[in-house]
Regions:
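C-terminal and inter-domain tail/linker signature
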Residues: 21-297
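Positively charged n-region of N-terminal signal peptides that target proteins for export
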Residues: 1-4
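Hydrophobic helical h-region of N-terminal Sec-dependent signal peptides
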Residues: 6-16
Length: 297
């Protein structure tokens, strides 16, 4: 009896499957992301060089864009024509990372002239020679601790050269450490690989304005519980850097980019971009005096 009932249930499920499939979501209009994409580091480097020039000219036409590529700005899908990449910007500095395992790039662009300052973080996803996704985080005046002048000043003072092999950190440990940092917003007992010296550049606010050789990034996490979700990783082993795209405070929370530079297994540089309203930094990397925090309760 049990066998008969079980067999009948399996048959009913099998017969129902086509009907369920017919009522399922429509197919995506975008080319799917690939679990194990193919690319080379040289391809990725050529791609970021073309992207930076494209941002200078206001066109991505020189990029090998898939006809069904997906375009996102601040983690919302948009039409290609609506992206800031269509606006010619006077790029003051560009820092690019390349992950030839995941076939992703990340380029941090600072714009201080032209009337509207920006700090951008743009990812390109490559597979078989074509860009299948363009994903840009755009921050500007009014966003969290924003100050493009300070961001430019301190980025150019930092060392972002490729590391010697003996200075590099295993990718799995880089991901673990980045997760420990982000988990620290909800759990204050995580094992974060703090190094010395270390400096954090958050929108424009800088933790080592005095260039101290003993500076630490361990300046405390904000109180309370804040979950950092939707994490997406890019690891540049040669640079010793991991970049994490994520959302602050839930699946619809603020779009964010955290970039961690490891040397000898420890954090030495951290850059963050967060596209939510907040207090502002000044040109020296400190807080604007009397700035109101729109996120304060």
């Amino acid at each position: 009896m049990i066998r008969t009932t079980f067999a009948a249930a399996l048959l009913a499920a099998a017969l129902a499957t086509p009907a369920l499939a017919q009522n399922g979501p429509p197919p995506s209009p975008y080319t799917p992301r690939v679990d194990k994409p193919t690319c080379t580091r040289d391809e990725l480097k050529a791609l970021t060089a073309a992207y930076v020039e494209g941002q200078r000219s206001g066109s991505l036409a020189a990029l090998p864009l898939h006809e069904k590529a997906q375009y996102l700005q601040n983690m919302e899908t948009i039409e290609p024509a609506a992206g800031l990449w269509n606006t010619a910007l006077p790029v003051a500095n560009a820092l690019s990372l390349h992950d030839d395992k995941r076939c992703k790039t990340f380029t941090e662009i600072v714009v201080t002239d032209g009337g509207t300052p920006y700090i951008l973080g743009t990812r390109l996803y490559l597979h078989e020679g074509q860009v299948i996704r363009v994903d840009s985080i755009v921050t500007k005046t009014g966003d969290w601790l924003f100050n493009a002048n300070a961001f430019l000043k301190y980025t150019k003072q930092e060392n972002w050269q490729p590391l010697h092999a003996y200075q590099r950190t295993e990718p799995a440990e880089m991901i673990r450490g980045a997760n420990a940092y982000l988990d620290g917003f909800s759990d204050k007992f995580t094992d974060i690989p703090w190094g010395v010296p270390c400096a954090r550049l958050e929108g424009g606010a800088y933790t080592n304005r005095d260039n101290s050789p003993t500076a630490s990034c361990e300046v405390g996490m904000p109180p309370g519980v804040l979950y950092i979700v939707n994490r997406d990783y890019l690891v540049d082993e040669e640079m010793g850097v991991i970049n994490v795209y994520c959302r602050f405070g839930g699946s619809t929370g603020g779009p964010d980019s955290h970039t961690f530079r490891y040397i000898d297994g420890k954090f030495r540089q951290i850059h963050t971009l967060t596209a939510i309203p907040g207090p502002q930094a000044n040109d020296e990397g400190g807080m604007v005096r009397g700035a109101a925090d729109p996120n304060a309760s």
